[in-house]
């Protein structure tokens, strides 16, 4: 609400905090005072996280679509994120489902790697996104326009011809969301990296060998 970038997964507070209300309708002070379920910690700002990590590990930051329709109403959050990253020296990359957001990031912080979060976009899975927009986004047409270097695609759709096209052109392929070692093993036959939850994935080689 006050132009500060917050680190939080959902649009609504209920699932992760037990509180009511939309994140976008709260000030950063209110959100930092809102305790996460099972924790004494409040919702952190992006600056809080950057200060804590301080380059110790790479960060992949997803910028959430703000209007629920993948529309062109972007700018404020992207500016806030770019400002927080001005003096950050650690490894970081940015991504979003909304190609307008990724395009804005290409202008605001052109030296930071960026990518598109992608999906087959069945309209039944995206009821707030217009059918026409779903049809367009399913083809991943904005990769070049946004000067992306990777996509993060639905793990259930990695055999998509659109994903194969980008991989053949040199794009790095990430995927979401992997929920078991069995799914991970299958995904890694094609994907360069994964987003996982609900189990402990093996440490990447570069971490294990430190």
Task: Report each predicted region and the residues it spans.
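Metal-dependent phosphodiesterase/phospholipase catalytic core, i.e.
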Residues: 4, 9-121, 144-149, 153-155
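C-terminal active-site rim and adjoining tail of enzyme catalytic domains
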Residues: 117, 124-210
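A glycine-centered beta-loop-beta connector
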Residues: 1-5, 187
């Amino acid at each position: 609400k006050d132009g500060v970038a917050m680190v939080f997964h959902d649009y609504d507070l209920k699932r992760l905090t037990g509180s009511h209300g939309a994140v976008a309708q709260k000030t950063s002070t209110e959100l930092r005072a809102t305790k996460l379920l099972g924790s004494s910690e409040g919702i952190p700002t992006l600056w809080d996280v950057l200060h804590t990590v301080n380059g110790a590990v790479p960060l992949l930051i997803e910028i959430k679509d703000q209007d629920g329709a993948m529309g062109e109403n972007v700018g404020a959050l992207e500016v806030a994120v770019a400002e927080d990253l001005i003096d950050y020296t650690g490894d970081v990359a940015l991504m979003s489902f909304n190609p307008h957001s990724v395009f804005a990031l290409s202008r605001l912080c052109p030296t930071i790697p960026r990518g598109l979060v992608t999906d087959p976009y069945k309209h039944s899975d995206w009821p707030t996104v217009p059918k026409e927009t779903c049809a367009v986004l399913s083809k991943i047409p904005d990769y070049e326009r946004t000067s992306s270097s990777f996509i993060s695609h639905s793990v259930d759709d990695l055999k998509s011809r659109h994903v194969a096209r980008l991989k053949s052109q040199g794009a790095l392929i990430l995927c979401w969301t992997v929920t078991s070692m069995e799914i991970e093993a299958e995904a890694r036959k094609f994907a360069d990296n994964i987003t996982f939850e609900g189990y402990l994935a093996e440490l990447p080689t570069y971490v294990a060998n430190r």
